[in-house]
Structure formats: C-alpha cells, structure tokens
C-alpha cells in the first residue's frame, strides 16, 4: 500500500519540479532522503530515568526504537563525562518517513500554539531542513496525562536537493506550511 504523501510526490510534485527547474531526468528531481528525530536529554546525566522516558516517547512518535546517543567528550562545565548517555535519535526512511512527514504536516504542526508557519531560514545551504519543536505534546501519540516533563526535539529533513530553493519547493509541494 503506497502512502498518500508518496503518491502526491510522484503524481504532483515531480511534474511541478521538473517543469520549474527543467530537469532532464526523473532521477534528477529532488526527493526526501531521510528524516532524523533527535531528542537531547541534558538532565539524563543526573537522572537516567529521564532518558528512558524520552526514548519511550520518541519511540511512540516515530514508530521505531530510538538509538541512545552518548557524549563524545567530557565537558566539566556541564558535569558531563565521555560515554555517558545524553540523548536519543531515530532515523526514518521509506514508508515510515512518508507516514511521519504526512502526520507532521497535517496533524502535529497545526497543533502548535500560535502557529504561523515554519521558518524559511532553517535550510542549511545544501537542501536540508531543520525544525525545532518545543514540546512533544503536539504529536497525537503522546498522552498528555502520562507526560512528566515537556521535552523538545529536533527534526531534520534530509533531501537530495542541491540548493535551498529546490528543497523549499519540494517541501512546499509536500504540504510543509512555511511562514509567509
């Protein structure tokens, strides 16, 4: 079963991008490569239970088990030692990636308080888009009663686009609500 967003990409976005940027091959048209969700849990240094809860929430949001990330080097100012678990991340590809992007655009982002669109300045110059979410409560899988602490997460949408303009057109075609 093909995802609704993937069908939209193939039937509407690819022809529109081909026409706008004059691609000679269908393979040259940019596509979403992967989506990386990262949740940094700074207070996991003092309380390991916080990391477990954050990882469980990330698993609910993404539908797959997160990878626990560890500190690469010690920083005395943060009371951090090398090798201590300080976060969780998930890399989504394929079917799950399209399902998550569809859910993010249609359900989660409209639930953000005072939402006027996502910023257009968050492109990295190579066609990738980074979005910070201040609270995990915007996702429908998270039950408000079970949340002990509001945590934010980073969402990185990696595309095969070469420029930010191509990437912006791709994401706009997929329904990403950019601020005017």
Swiss-Prot record:
<keyword id="KW-0820">tRNA-binding</keyword>
<dbReference type="InterPro" id="IPR020929">
    <property type="entry name" value="Ribosomal_uL5_CS"/>
</dbReference>
<dbReference type="GO" id="GO:1990904">
    <property type="term" value="C:ribonucleoprotein complex"/>
</dbReference>
<dbReference type="GO" id="GO:0006412">
    <property type="term" value="P:translation"/>
</dbReference>
<dbReference type="Pfam" id="PF00673">
    <property type="entry name" value="Ribosomal_L5_C"/>
</dbReference>
<dbReference type="InterPro" id="IPR020930">
    <property type="entry name" value="Ribosomal_uL5_bac-type"/>
</dbReference>
<dbReference type="GO" id="GO:0005840">
    <property type="term" value="C:ribosome"/>
</dbReference>
<protein>
    <recommendedName>
        <fullName>Large ribosomal subunit protein uL5</fullName>
    </recommendedName>
</protein>
<dbReference type="InterPro" id="IPR002132">
    <property type="entry name" value="Ribosomal_uL5"/>
</dbReference>
<dbReference type="InterPro" id="IPR022803">
    <property type="entry name" value="Ribosomal_uL5_dom_sf"/>
</dbReference>
<keyword id="KW-0687">Ribonucleoprotein</keyword>
<dbReference type="GO" id="GO:0000049">
    <property type="term" value="F:tRNA binding"/>
</dbReference>
<dbReference type="GO" id="GO:0019843">
    <property type="term" value="F:rRNA binding"/>
</dbReference>
<comment type="function">
    <text>This is one of the proteins that bind and probably mediate the attachment of the 5S RNA into the large ribosomal subunit, where it forms part of the central protuberance. In the 70S ribosome it contacts protein S13 of the 30S subunit (bridge B1b), connecting the 2 subunits; this bridge is implicated in subunit movement. Contacts the P site tRNA; the 5S rRNA and some of its associated proteins might help stabilize positioning of ribosome-bound tRNAs.</text>
</comment>
<keyword id="KW-0694">RNA-binding</keyword>
<keyword id="KW-0699">rRNA-binding</keyword>
<dbReference type="Pfam" id="PF00281">
    <property type="entry name" value="Ribosomal_L5"/>
</dbReference>
<dbReference type="InterPro" id="IPR031310">
    <property type="entry name" value="Ribosomal_uL5_N"/>
</dbReference>
<comment type="similarity">
    <text>Belongs to the universal ribosomal protein uL5 family.</text>
</comment>
<keyword id="KW-0689">Ribosomal protein</keyword>
<dbReference type="InterPro" id="IPR031309">
    <property type="entry name" value="Ribosomal_uL5_C"/>
</dbReference>
<comment type="subunit">
    <text>Part of the 50S ribosomal subunit; part of the 5S rRNA/L5/L18/L25 subcomplex. Contacts the 5S rRNA and the P site tRNA. Forms a bridge to the 30S subunit in the 70S ribosome.</text>
</comment>
<dbReference type="GO" id="GO:0003735">
    <property type="term" value="F:structural constituent of ribosome"/>
</dbReference>
């Amino acid at each position: 079963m093909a995802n609704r967003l993937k069908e939209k990409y193939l039937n509407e976005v690819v022809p529109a991008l081909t026409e706008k940027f004059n691609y000679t091959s269908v393979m040259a048209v940019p596509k979403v490569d992967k989506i990386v969700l990262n949740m940094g849990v700074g207070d996991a240094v003092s309380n390991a239970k916080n990391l477990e809860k954050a990882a469980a929430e990330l698993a609910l949001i993404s539908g797959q088990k997160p990878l626990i990330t560890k500190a690469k080097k010690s920083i005395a100012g943060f009371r951090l030692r090398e090798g201590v678990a300080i976060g969780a991340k998930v890399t989504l590809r394929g079917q799950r990636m399209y399902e998550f992007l569809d859910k993010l655009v249609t359900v989660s982002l409209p639930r953000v308080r005072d939402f006027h669109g996502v910023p257009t300045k968050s492109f990295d110059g190579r066609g990738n888009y980074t979005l910070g979410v201040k609270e995990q409560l915007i996702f429908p899988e998270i039950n408000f009663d079970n949340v002990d602490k509001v945590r934010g997460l980073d969402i990185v949408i990696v595309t095969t686009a070469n420029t930010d303009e191509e990437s912006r057109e791709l994401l706009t075609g997929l329904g990403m609500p950019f601020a005017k």
